[in-house]
Amino acid sequence: MANELQPLSLLFQNRLFLIPDYQRGYAWLQQQLVDFWDDLVNLQADRYHYTGLLSLKPLKCKETVSWGEDLWLVENGYKPCHIVDGQQRITTFVILLNEIVGFVRGLNENKGKSDKEITLGYETVEEIVSKYICRKRPPNGVVTTYLFGYEVDNPSAEYMKYKVFDEPYSGAVNETYYTKNLKFAKNFFAENIRKLYEESGEGGLEAVNTLYKKLTQRLMFNLHEIDDDYDVFVAFETMNNRGKKLTNLELLKNRLIYLTTLYDDEVFDEKDKSALRKKINDTWKEVYYQLGRNKSVPLSDDDFLRAHWIIYFRYSRKRGDDYIKFLLSKFSSKGIFEKAPVLVETEAESVISDDVTDADDTEVTETEEQEIIEVSKLQPKEIEDYVNSLKAVSYTHLRAHETE
């Protein structure tokens, strides 16, 4: 287990960062961005700034088999990691770094130059991009692998690649509440870098160089690598409720995905677990899409969850957070580990007497056996039914608000 202070220039050495599916999307708003920017700009060039905890879960080979064309970096010694805690800060860092690179590329003195010819903080832009943003697989460079991103079924994955990193040929890219935050952060940093450059007069380029060096060398993370036997779902729920708290919708998603991992393989095998997990992810993708369709006035997560709770569980109470207390109690590990007896009837067996000599006189008797087995009180089907209902109601919830 690693537990040490490191700047981002070391953190990004031979690592691939991925935000897992149980994580929320990018949740920082203007106030968090202003605080981050002010801390960085006001940091003295010879001082360090403690940025907080970064908890990583190293991934095993079997957890990366679906990465396809991106596996080449793993095969070349890169260490794939899930970000359990600290993803908001790392995402912010990557967005800001990308905007610094884009700004320097666009300066008049760099027009027509390749990334090999443009320097920033004693490094070429080509070196910076390959260290912090993406690598192209040699020799042809057809495959581009990003060093930071989201699970592929997360709408933010495509948005990050095409709208934040500006990779061309995106086609249609879905937008959500979280991608709106990514867009805001990108524009926020682009504008502030431009202002910093202009307000610094003749020292504008040096000011941007200093910003880059402070960003990569002076922001210190407390790196913590989580052991294999550590419960990352519980860790995520605990850690991410300390700073900008998880919404109830985010908390519930993490809880349901966590529960899918607890069933015995004999009852619910890996393919079933993967299918249910995908169904949960697809449902949350649809829910966030419906709630965020009106980008200027997105619908409330809490109002939606409460409304669905009343419909699905036929509750009429509307006091405070009754609904989330009920849901987190209903969908808990206790419901899986506690067993309930179930009576199972086996098929009847036909028994033919050995004494029979005439086929017409064959005496057939049937014996029935009954067996009691222990099963989890909370069955996978119950989770699936709830998730399906949540997805269906998200659309009608939107329609109801449109007609108000």
Where are these regions (language model features)?
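Flexible coil/loop and intrinsically disordered segments
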Residues: 1-402
